[in-house]
Amino acid sequence: MNYLDIIQDREIVAILGQIDILKQADCKYFGILHTLSTIEFAKQLSKCFDLTDEEENLLLIACALHNIGHLNGKNLHAQTGAEMAKVYLTKHGMDIKDVNIIGNAISSHLGRRNDNFYDSVSACLILADKMDFGSTRIKPNFEEMSFEDEVLRHITKVNVSRTGDVVELMLGGIDVDWKVFVQSSAYAKLYRCFETVCKKYNYSFVVRVKKVN
């Protein structure tokens, strides 16, 4: 099973469609477009995090299912979605070990605890999810989404060339202890991604994260 099987499954398409209808008044998109955009960011992050093909497949499946819990309301949607995903994946014959990895990623995708980032699949889902909500997207063609473009947009927006600032701005929705987070392997890998983009476009590269004083 892969993410394409899931996003083409009538059951999942129906759930995401219902979520889009339920969330119309929120001016946010938790359904189909957000799911597809999150998948696109995750594909790029999987390369930054050096995920194996197997890990990338699990990540993209987690992306495809990460918000299905919104069908039962926003509160606790991460936990509800994780349980729904486990039932769905088990029903379709997925190995229990892989089911648990995906379930853990979905349950922790809000990124509210530093230990949510210890697992690479979970970390990539959190980052991809937050990058989509931090992007310029207002119902665009999801294929136009670009991790590189978002890094550059944030650099231009705040008129800074300090990668640490851009990391914080792009991931502002992550409610973690930044003093701890900047010491984590997830931050180190993300930092490397930003460094690559900055150097490609000749931005000076100086680390400064405002929340860490």
What are these regions (language model features)?
Residues 48-161:
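Divalent metal-dependent catalytic cores for phosphoryl transfer on phosphate-bearing substrates
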Residues 41-44, 105, 130, 193:
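Alpha-helical scaffold segments in carbohydrate-active enzymes
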Residues 4-5, 13-20, 103, 107, ...:
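Generic detector of well-ordered alpha-helical segments enriched in charged/polar residues
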Residues 135-213:
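Terminal helices and disordered tails flanking the catalytic cores of nucleotide-processing hydrolases
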Residues 1-76:
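Acidic/His-rich, divalent-metal-binding segments that scaffold phosphate/diphosphate chemistry
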